[in-house]
Structures are given as structure tokens and as C-alpha cells.
Regions:
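Glycine-rich phosphate-binding loop of nucleotide-binding enzymes
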Residues: 9-90
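P-loop NTPase motor domains
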Residues: 1-24, 73-85, 91-93, 98-249
């Protein structure tokens, strides 16, 4: 019989071949599909294997960044030991991620603001708690473009706008629907759940970032996941423009 071996140059150690007893050293970027899954019953070492791969990537490849979404707060010790950025996300956390952070490479569109408008529409649906109509969509799209106007004119440098600025733009519109949207999102811009309406105060440029979502409550979980995934998209598009690799766990 034949034994299938995997031994890539510049790869990392994953396991040992059960037949040949040789090491399995793989570089996922050399594969047709670089995605991977870790399967196993509880206690079989899935998290340990993920941590070993994270350590290997960080130590062996200076041109790669690692981003974690941690629902159980099990990666904190590893991230802190490797001088990464552990971001606790909750309604009462001191860590804030601006939902309207935007870089010039965002999305696949030549106009990043247009791509961001789609995210803001999805976010507003979550904030309002129901599907939004055609009039509301037009108002949100217009106000998003207006909110980003000066930031875009400055080539996306400086401080990005926030949801609080977006709400002020809504209040400046003449349509009563705009006032209704502004009232609906007030809880998330100026109320007790305004954690995503403030400027980002964490290092989202670190090579190793962990988004700790354990303390996200029921009200914030859908919104929090949208913002976290959008923040990750921001980083991926930045890295793609730089020719860097991004690994998501």
C-alpha cells in the first residue's frame, strides 16, 4: 500500500502519521484550500492543538497575523504571554471598538464607503430590531455617506466618525422616518449599550488579537458579533493590501 505524506518547506508541525510514524509538517498556504477544521470529542485536545498552531504561526512567520474569537475566555493566558491584544467586549467593558472604523482598502469595492453602507444597513436592522423599509434604507445610506464625507476627503486618515455622529446626521434630516431611526438607535449611541459608539481604544494593529465575547449579553450579542466580524474584515483588507496573511481562529 501507499502512505500519503505531508512535508512542506516552511511548514509547521501538526501531528505524526499513524502509518509511517513520520511528522506531518504542513504549510496551509501551499494547499488548494487553506482552511482547516479541528474535530474531536470534549477533552480530546482541540483547544490545545489550536494553541499550538497559533504559537507556531506567530513564531515562524513574521508576515502573518492571527485573530481569535474567544467565546469561553480560554485564550487569554496565551495571548498575554505572547504580547497580544486581548479585547474584552461587553456593555460595561473599558475596551471599545468603533462600529464605524473604516480603512481605504475596506471591502472589494473601489469605494469603501459604499461597501461600509451595506454593513451599516445590517447594523441598523439589528439596532432597530426589525426589517427596515425602502425609505429607511435610503435615509441610512444617505446619512452614512454624509457621516463619512470629511473622513473620506482626508483619505481615511485621522479619527473615524462614530455612531453618535451618524445619529446626529439622522436628526439633521427632514424626514420623520429619520427621526424614528435616530430614536430607535439612541440606546446604542447614547444609552447604556453604547460600547460600539465610541472611538476604538484598543490596539487593533497587534499581530495577535483576541476578541473575548464571553460577557456579551443577549441584547448585545447579535450587534457585537456584527461589529467584531466587521473589525476583522477591516484587518483582513488591510493585510491583503500589504501582502500579509491573516489566520482566523
Amino acid at each position: 500500500f501507499r502512505v500519503q505524506e505531508v512535508s512542506h518547506s516552511n511548514g509547521i508541525y501538526y501531528a505524526r502519521n499513524v502509518i509511517s510514524k513520520n511528522m506531518i509538517v504542513a504549510n496551509r498556504r501551499n494547499l488548494l484550500n487553506g482552511n482547516s477544521f479541528i474535530f474531536g470529542v470534549s477533552g480530546s485536545g482541540k483547544s490545545l492543538m489550536a494553541k499550538q498552531e497559533i504559537i507556531s504561526i506567530i513564531l515562524s512567520d513574521n508576515n502573518a497575523d492571527v485573530i481569535l474569537i474567544d467565546p469561553e475566555r480560554e485564550y487569554y493566558p496565551l495571548v498575554n504571554a505572547m504580547n497580544g491584544e486581548a479585547i474584552n467586549i461587553s456593555a460595561t467593558s473599558r475596551n471599545h471598538i468603533n462600529a464605524m472604523d473604516l480603512n481605504k482598502d475596506y471591502g472589494d469595492d473601489s469605494n469603501p464607503v459604499s461597501a461600509k453602507c451595506e454593513f451599516i444597513l445590517s447594523l441598523c436592522e439589528q439596532l432597530i430590531g426589525s426589517e427596515i423599509g425602502a425609505k429607511q434604507r435610503s435615509i441610512i445610506d444617505r446619512c452614512t455617506a454624509n457621516t463619512y464625507r470629511y473622513y473620506q476627503q482626508g483619505n481615511f486618515q485621522g479619527t473615524p466618525p462614530t455612531l453618535q455622529g451618524f445619529r446626529r446626521e439622522l436628526l439633521d434630516q427632514d424626514e420623520p422616518e429619520a427621526k424614528e431611526i435616530a430614536l430607535a438607535i439612541e440606546l446604542f449611541t447614547h444609552g447604556s449599550l453604547n460600547t460600539f459608539a465610541k472611538p476604538t481604544n484598543v490596539d487593533t494593529d497587534n499581530r495577535l488579537i483576541c476578541y473575548d465575547i464571553l460577557d456579551l449579553g443577549k441584547q448585545l450579542m447579535p450587534i457585537g458579533m456584527l461589529v467584531v466580524l466587521d473589525s476583522i474584515l477591516n484587518r483582513i483588507t488591510q493585510n491583503r493590501a500589504k501582502g500579509k496573511n491573516t489566520f482566523i481562529f
